[in-house]
Amino acid sequence: TFLLVSLFTLALGIGATTAIFSVIKAVVLNPLPYEAPEQIAVLWEVNPEGNQERVAVPTYEDWKREARTLQAVAAYRQVDFSYAGTGDPRNVPGVRATPDLFTVLRAQAFLGRTFVPEESVVGADRVVVVSHGFWTRELGANPAAIGQSIQLDAVPFTVVGVMPPVFEFPTSTNVEAWTPLAFDPKDLHGASRRARSLTIVG
């Protein structure tokens, strides 16, 4: 569980417009299964009314480019996948994340690997890292599951990694699958600064 408190406010000039961002530091109530969890911060955009909002893709890219005090900045979006295993299809809580996410969390795979930068490109993003529980229940805890294909939203994804049993992210959701978050340059909606759907960690 996180208690979010304001750490500091960062003013960043983007073109002719000055954007004000509130940087939130995660304070640990219960020890989280990450290395140096006290160094993980959640970044929000603050609207004129002072309310925290998620972040648009162009804003995330600005922050990532301009970041000076953070070693890495990652974006993620929570989703539900439709998983077609051996039984009836079921919803699987998931996350689409930039490859930097596991770097920010200093998290390594229990089996296989996490994402590589090349998998943030549309067309190269059909890989998945699964939770230890998913691997046990759905894939028989078989090490040979690495390299196998599973169906998420009727699309084949190659299993490249299994996370450790204690790994949770986000901690408020029982996430079972992580896939790369690739930004399509042809997606005009995604290129809008008004389309705020990302959570940023650094």
Question: What are these model-derived regions, one by one?
Answer:
Residues L12-Q39:
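Alpha-helical transmembrane segments
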Residues V46-N51, T86-D88, P164-V166, G202:
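Structural beta->alpha junctions
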Residues T1-F8, L12, A16:
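Membrane-interface helix starts
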Residues F21, E53, R90, V95, ...:
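Residues that recognize and position ribonucleotide moieties
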Residues D80, P93-P117, R126-G202:
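Mid-to-C-terminal secondary-structure elements
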Residues V42-E45, P58-V116:
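Short amphipathic beta-strand/extended segments in non-transmembrane regions
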